């Protein structure tokens, strides 16, 4: 439904508050919990004579790994995205030209399909563990769009924030660090490069000796999530592929 709406440029209306109750945008049942509202809608349809039938059916519902009693449901919220077209453009040629070989070769098609239909990468996760998003928000009046800076640490963020008009006297305590963590694959895709400090110290003795390696043995289910992204990182930061064969 969401993708269909995007295709036709439909307005996105979020009827839920962060706590799962209905917001003012819903118009009806405002402030009530969504689970109770579902039951109430059925009752109201029945009372209005609009309910055609009620029947049971089997559906696959995901549940939270942290709370097995909580169903996982989609919700509109702000996320961080990485533009991926550039990375797809630099990661596809090495495979199509045979610089990297897949065994069996049929998985080249899988790889190609992913990269030729690339979407931007949602890199933020609402988790308490992982690498934290390096963004710091400035104090913002209610209803105004939040301003932020991206920095290695709070001290660097403070220096950047003070360069913004109106925030020359801001303090470190007033900065709010983004609570989200990076997608686990965001650190994994850098593994061949970062293992030997290839980003901060390119051309050092270890990475010059070990990079690229010969073979990668992995599963076909993560050809895009890990294999393709490692190739992207290698091409971007080392200007060479991280391995020659993928099994």
Protein language model regions, located:
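Residue patterns forming the tRNA-binding/recognition surfaces of aminoacyl-tRNA synthetases
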Residues: 1-143, 174, 222
């Amino acid at each position: 439904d969401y993708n269909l709406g995007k295709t036709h440029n439909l307005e996105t209306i979020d009827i839920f508050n962060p706590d799962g109750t209905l917001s003012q945008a819903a118009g009806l049942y405002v402030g009530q919990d969504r689970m109770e509202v579902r039951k109430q809608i059925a009752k109201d349809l029945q009372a209005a004579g609009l309910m055609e039938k009620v029947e049971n059916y089997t559906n696959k519902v995901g549940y939270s790994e942290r709370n097995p009693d909580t169903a996982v449901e989609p919700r509109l919220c702000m996320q961080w995205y990485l533009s991926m077209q550039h990375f797809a453009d630099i990661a596809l040629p090495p495979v199509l030209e045979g610089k990297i070989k897949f065994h069996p070769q049929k998985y080249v098609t899988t790889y190609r399909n992913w990269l030729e239909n690339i979407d931007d990468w949602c890199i933020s996760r609402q988790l308490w563990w992982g690498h934290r998003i390096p963004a710091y928000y400035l104090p913002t009046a209610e209803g105004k769009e939040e301003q932020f800076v991206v920095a290695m640490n709070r001290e660097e963020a403070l220096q950047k924030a003070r360069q913004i008009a109106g925030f020359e006297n801001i303090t470190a305590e007033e900065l709010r660090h983004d609570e989200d963590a990076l997608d686990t694959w965001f650190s994994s895709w850098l593994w061949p490069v970062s293992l030997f400090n290839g980003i901060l110290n390119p051309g050092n003795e270890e990475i010059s000796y070990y990079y690229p390696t010969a073979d990668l043995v992995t599963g076909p289910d993560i050809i895009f999530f890990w294999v393709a992204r490692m190739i992207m990182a290698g091409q971007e930061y080392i200007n060479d592929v991280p391995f020659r064969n993928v099994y």
